[in-house]
Amino acid sequence: MAAERYNPRVAEAHWQKVWEENRTFETDNSDSREKYYVLEMFPYPSGRIHMGHVRNYAMGDVVARYKRAKGFNVLHPMGWDAFGMPAENAAMQNKVHPKEWTYQNIATMKRQLKSMGLSLDWSREFATCDVEYYHRQQMLFIDLYEKGLVTRKTSKVNWDPVDNTVLANEQVVDGRGWRSGALVEQRELTQWFFKITDFSEELLAGLDTLDQWPEKVRLMQRNWIGKSEGLQVRFALAAGTAPAGFSEVEVYTTRPDTLFGAAFVAISADHPLAKKLSEGNAALSSFIEECHQQGTSLAALETAEKKGFDTGIKVKHPFDDNWELPVYVANFVLMEYGTGAVFGCPAHDQRDLDFANKYKLKVTPVVLPKGEDAASFSIGETAYTDDGVMINSRFLDGMTPEAAFNEVASRLEKTDLVGRPQAVRKVQFRLRDWGISRQRYWGCPIPMIHCESCGVNPVPRADLPVKLPDDVEFDRPGNPLDRHATWRHVKCPKCGGDARRETDTMDTFVDSSWYYTRFTAPWENEPTDRKAADHWLPVDQYIGGIEHAILHLLYSRFFTRAMKVAGHVGVDEPFKGLFTQGMVVHETYKANGQWVSPADIRIEEIDGKRVATMLDSGAPVEIGSIEKMSKSKKNVVDPDDIIASYGADTARWFVLSDSPPERDVIWTEAGAEGAHRFVQRIWRLVAEAAPALKDVAPKAGTQGEALGVSKAAHKAVKAVGDDIEKLAFNRGVARLYELVNTLSGALQQAADGKADAEMKGALREATEMLVLMTAPMMPHLAEQCLAELGGKVAGKETLVARAPWPVFDPALVVENEIVLPVQINGKKRGDLTIARDADQASIQQAVLELDFVKAALNGGSPKKIIVVPQRIVNVVA
């Protein structure tokens, strides 16, 4: 009898209600089972989830459901990274308060996430804009302040002229603001900083322990931390060229071996010497102002055109008083890095070469590539940056660069310049302290008070939280807190006099730097429950995009260390395993030069070609490239539409099945339809066979087709489990396709009443295994199938969500036969299929019976038959 078509809309709503009523996914901290903490990066509540969210959270849910089935006490929470600029932009554009806009979006997105059937513990939900959350963040801030990990200082900052706020160096991408895309400028402001540089060495060394992180992410962090071992060299200013009070320029270099190739010294626009020289020099003052228009990050420097201003000052070469080098103020040198001064060796640094060519400075190669002739070697448009031997370097000639480094260091360390060594070895880090002050309203208020008499002091703990005022106006750019009539005015906690609140709010990356810790006990009055935090942390599996490799992930690594210093956690690293998933991408479409949505077009195959037209008018549509889904290009697919049309399980199955999870997945309507057909196929096979299997005890087959069914199922259990452990979801999906194909004929026999008792037992077990294996990917379908089978696993009534992962029998997983390649005189001629435990004599006899061996021997006997056990056979004719 044909089964009714599976109705995902009805089934999914039903099982989601059952899970919720049974509190199936709520986690008890006191559970004694081994813990497993799986977490996907929590979303910003922008309005609606997109297919990237579906893929990210589906992956995490597979891991959570699988680990739960394997007997772990799983923590799988969800929250909202809810502070940030878009809410303020919406307030300005739509005249809606950021709080209202944010919580409306949270409600919408929570409904969407729930419709996906994710096994989330919603009892631990919070938004970072909840007063209860940012209250604890303010407590943390004060704790870190008291431990000396927060400081306030004046510094050059990256200023986003569109968003009217400061950006951390990590938030400047190719010289532009990470959100607005505006070219970033330099400004000097007094800011609050987290002293992440206190942990530079620790953060670098810790990367070696993160063997479950992608090497690409670890490399990105290593480069960002940027440890370098170099030499700090003092260059004496040439007599008669230096202004009063200046006698030297101190330079940090990682390549002292190239000193004899030096062509210039460059100093920062903020170097004390540059400032002194700019007094009364309008041209230099103008150049310095131009330098200040670019960002302070290394990325900004790397993308800007390299410019310099010749100061007329000269410095003496450290090894030759008669050799003088010009001093430039340059836009590619930052005061915050090293000493604010560098020497340029054009032959062996591309930036220096470009600069030297622009200002017609001498280019002298001092490192000779292997195999080149010193007499004829020269530098063209590309600097030579590899290894070699030293040339044109006097006493260094013939040395390797490494030996030359040490020789230069040794000599200059022993050379006296005005009572001090001319050089000292020094370790530098590229990493700078994390500036967290933001001139925005919609963020966590910094809990500090400014008093003219007492200075800057923390808000007393009893007065926390410092709440954001609701009565603010967004009628113009800038920070509404600065303009608030009453909020910023407060009494000094020390003297009781008039004082003012800090009106800057925290960088929103602070909110996401410790949220994983709060999930362990979100009901606690303190930021953490130390026992719960130490039990659950580190997160066993963290899943999110590689775009967070530096920003969020580095800040989180700092925060666990800072919280450890403050006594809130006992771990150093927040995330044991990290997986960075690929994006969901889609074709793009244009009609009359305008982007059009895939929902508005029809695609047909005409004469072997895909042809697209508009649904409403039939107008031709140009099919473009496959790109990341984006609203601007309209190549987005709304998860609500997919779930309404096909069901959540189809959406989940498709994003898990089509490509390796670390790669992009191309969303296609045909792919979604194919996934949906598979959902219907599983349902039909199980539902039609269910009457015959419902009251049958599961039992592995021992012979014939029943044994084949059991072998296929047990092998799949082992393989799919291994695949999920390795996060190879697409391979697990492929194995389930194979298993369904293998079982389909036997299930149809059972449905037709043609299966014997042994086959029914084998099918009952195999079908239970199939249902339990599909559950992490398609949980609603799995529950519906098990209900159809009587709601029992191994004879016990249960929800699939609470059922254990099936156990395979090792004897059924081992292949009894193997295929051995057969060579004749060293060349493969065919294969031999034989029992795995066959002895050497049996293998030799079987080989002689093969037709292609008989033909090769032509009635004769072989000289020798070489059998490599379990590997290969070679017949020597």
Swiss-Prot record:
Residues bound to ATP: 631
Keywords, comma-separated and alphabetical: Aminoacyl-tRNA synthetase, ATP-binding, Cytoplasm, Ligase, Nucleotide-binding, Protein biosynthesis
A biological-process GO annotation: leucyl-tRNA aminoacylation
GO MF annotation list: aminoacyl-tRNA deacylase activity; ATP binding; leucine-tRNA ligase activity
SUPFAM superfamilies: Anticodon-binding domain of a subclass of class I aminoacyl-tRNA synthetases, Nucleotidylyl transferase, ValRS/IleRS/LeuRS editing domain
PROSITE patterns tied to this protein: AA_TRNA_LIGASE_I (PS00178)
Disulfide linkage: none
UniProt key word Cytoplasm: yes
GO CC, any one term: cytosol
InterPro entries, alphabetized: aa-tRNA-synth_I_CS, aa-tRNA-synth_Ia, Leu-tRNA-ligase, Leu_tRNA-synth_edit, M/V/L/I-tRNA-synth_anticd-bd, Methionyl/Leucyl_tRNA_Synth, Rossmann-like_a/b/a_fold, tRNAsynth_Ia_anticodon-bd
Catalytic reaction list: tRNA(Leu) + L-leucine + ATP = L-leucyl-tRNA(Leu) + AMP + diphosphate
CDD domains the record matches: Anticodon_Ia_Leu_BEm, LeuRS_core
The UniProt record lists the keyword Ligase: yes
E.C. designation(s): 6.1.1.4
Motif residue range(s): 'HIGH' region: 43-53
Compartments, record wording: Cytoplasm
Motif, 'KMSKS' region: chain positions: 628-632
Family recorded in the similarity comment: Belongs to the class-I aminoacyl-tRNA synthetase family.
Name of the protein in its database record: Leucine--tRNA ligase
Originating species: Brucella ovis (strain ATCC 25840 / 63/290 / NCTC 10512)
